[in-house]
A protein has these predicted regions:
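Alpha/beta-hydrolase active-site loop
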Residues: 1-19
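Alpha/beta-hydrolase fold nucleophile elbow
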Residues: 20-32
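Alpha/beta-hydrolase-fold enzymes
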Residues: 29, 33, 37-123
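Active-site nucleophile elbow and catalytic-triad environment of alpha/beta-hydrolase enzymes
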Residues: 122-141
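Short beta-strand/loop motif that positions the catalytic acidic residue
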Residues: 150-152
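Conserved loop-alpha-helix segment in the C-terminal half of the alpha/beta-hydrolase fold
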Residues: 154-193
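Catalytic active-site module of serine/aspartate enzymes centered on a nucleophile-bearing elbow/loop
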Residues: 188-225
Length: 225
């Protein structure tokens, strides 16, 4: 992908079909990159007749990097990505995330490892560019006119070996970036920390994901009765 706005047409078409099936309200939801995409969609289409609330599950509002890397390295890679979109660069993603999920390793879930491989050592620079451009809009502050719930783990870690941190933390993104960028947003915005949550909160350990759903449904009862 070279521009996250490429997804807008697909989301709009899906909402059109949902409306044709006589549904009158939708909770727009997205995880990680999807959380970034859906947040911006809600900002860009503030008067959509179906979208009544937004749930962002550990949204990708910034890269899990140092301040220097964010201010210098990422913009430079983004610029290279505009010129050399297919070039690859080390992703820096923690190698223990997928093993914490998949039943083949240490997790409880079954999914296609060709689609979501055990590790992703490299990333195309066009992806870095697309994400960076979208994040710049988030960082400036956006307005959301629908109730928004941003949920994330209570902590981020970058474990170098398998252990408890990989099972009870967000090892992909920095949760502080989520809360800091949420504070820049205008509207009915709520952030919620989930103790021992994984990056994808609904794939966390059973007691944790049960709490995720309890909190989400309690919020929905207030915002989308």
């Amino acid at each position: 992908v070279r521009d996250l706005r490429e997804y807008d047409a697909e989301i709009s078409k899906a909402l059109e079909i949902i409306g044709q099936e006589n549904h009158n309200q939708v909770l727009l939801a997205g995880h990680s990159t999807g959380g970034l995409i859906t947040t911006l969609y809600a900002a860009h289409y503030p008067d959509h007749r179906l979208v009544k609330a937004l749930w962002a599950n550990s949204p990708f509002y910034d890269f899990f990097k140092s301040i220097i890397e964010k201010k210098v390295g990422i913009p430079l890679l983004s610029e290279f990505g505009k010129r050399f979109p297919n070039a690859k660069f080390p992703s820096g993603l923690n190698p223990w995330y997928v093993p914490s999920l998949h039943k083949k390793f240490h997790g409880e879930w079954e999914f296609n490892l060709e689609w979501k491989p055990e590790s992703m050592p490299f990333v195309q620079l066009c992806f870095v560019h697309a994400i960076h451009e979208a994040q710049k809009e988030i960082h400036k502050g956006i307005t959301l006119n629908i109730p928004t719930l941003i949920m994330h783990s209570h902590q981020s870690k970058y474990p170098k070996k398998w252990g408890i941190d990989a099972q009870q933390s967000d090892v992909i993104l920095d949760v502080k970036d989520m809360t800091n960028n949420a504070k820049k947003m205008k509207g009915d915005i709520q952030t919620l920390s989930v103790h021992n949550g994984l990056h994808d909160l609904v794939l966390s350990a059973p007691p944790v994901r049960e709490k995720v759903y309890q909190d989400l449904f309690a919020w929905l009862e207030q915002k989308m009765p």
